[in-house]
């Protein structure tokens, strides 16, 4: 078995779960890092969030803790799909930059990311993490499309 891990992007969404399932199907038994990237907020956003959530706690820690919970859920799903998975959480803005940075750091064989299937105006306003990852990564990127009805 190849020791080079795959990187699976996971945010708890249905498209992220489909990405895990696709990775397990294409790379059975492979070592995988399941990554959730939490947004890195500005100081003003952090102060507002901290004061309303947990006084005296650094918001970045709260944000990373939440991302780690999400990544652990994804890693559990990946292990159930027979991948050798470990969770990882990072904070970054934009999200795609955090994904590309981690992929480079772990020398991922491939980045697996789900797509919400946005197009046209919606994609222009909301952005597409999968598109940006594919545009900026220096390694293969597998974009798993949404389920079509």
What residues fall within each predicted segment?
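General small-molecule cofactor/ligand-binding pocket signal
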Residues: 33-35, 86-90, 142
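Small/aliphatic-rich secondary-structure junction motif
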Residues: 2-55
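Glycine-rich, Arg-bearing micro-motifs that act as flexible, cationic patches
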Residues: 3, 110-136, 146-149
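Structural beta-alpha unit
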Residues: 1, 76-111, 148-149
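Solvent-exposed polar/charged
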Residues: 25, 104-105, 135
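Active-site phosphate/pyrophosphate- and oxyanion-stabilizing loops and adjacent acidic/basic residues
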Residues: 21, 100, 131
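A short acidic, glycine-rich active-site loop
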Residues: 53-69
